[in-house]
Amino acid sequence: MVSSWRVQQAAQNIRAGAVIAYPTEAVWGLGCDPWDEEAVYRLLAIKLRPVEKGLILIADNIRQFDFLFEDFPELWLDRMASTWPGPNTWLVPHQNLLPEWITGIHETVALRVTDHPTVRELCALVGPLISTSANPAGRPAARSRLRVEQYFRGQINGVLGGSLGGRRNPSVIRDIATGQVMRAG
């Protein structure tokens, strides 16, 4: 586990507009403050990802997403709560409560409550984070810090060290309304 002072330093950097890399359950991720438009667009440019595709928000607990859930049916809340924390991402209506640099062209946003201890600690300090796999578009996701550094040397503001969570595949993505799997995990 990464020492708390390193996580605190990463949190401070994120609050200052940094784009950082960090280990997740299966692959390395890139992240930043979702409310910092400049940081999000810098992340998208680094990754060569079109804004239209949208991004995932991760959190350390479901309460960090409460602002989105005001009119949600109990069934939806139960679906999410029964799979979190863990490698389950849900597509939920954003109800125009999030900017397009997060949602892209979609009427939904992808949400996940992580069970990776380092990322949970980071989210507990800064709130929800943008999270996307650490790879340029069209390249395999980084599974090592070395690969992150090869992909993004000089382009990101830091790397929060640590180990991957041991999963082989990224999270499953499901639609909250239908339960349909959009991406297998």
Swiss-Prot record:
Q: Which Gene Ontology terms cover its molecular function?
A: ATP binding; double-stranded RNA binding; L-threonylcarbamoyladenylate synthase; tRNA binding
Name the domain of life: Bacteria
Q: Where in the cell is it found?
A: Cytoplasm
For this UniProt entry, what is the primary localization, expressed as one broad class? cytoplasm
Quote the EC number: 2.7.7.87
Principal EC category: transferase
Q: Which Gene3D superfamilies does the UniProt entry name for this protein? A: DHBP synthase
Note one Pfam family from the annotation.
Answer: Sua5_yciO_yrdC
SUPFAM superfamilies, sorted = YrdC/RibB
User: What reaction(s) does this enzyme catalyze?
Assistant: L-threonine + hydrogencarbonate + ATP = L-threonylcarbamoyladenylate + diphosphate + H2O
Gene Ontology terms: biological process: regulation of translational fidelity; tRNA threonylcarbamoyladenosine modification
Instruction: Spell out the family assignment given in the record's similarity comment.
Output: Belongs to the SUA5 family. TsaC subfamily.
Function recorded in the entry: Required for the formation of a threonylcarbamoyl group on adenosine at position 37 (t(6)A37) in tRNAs that read codons beginning with adenine. Catalyzes the conversion of L-threonine, HCO(3)(-)/CO(2) and ATP to give threonylcarbamoyl-AMP (TC-AMP) as the acyladenylate intermediate, with the release of diphosphate.
- Protein name, please? Threonylcarbamoyl-AMP synthase
**Species of origin:** Pseudomonas syringae pv. tomato (strain ATCC BAA-871 / DC3000)
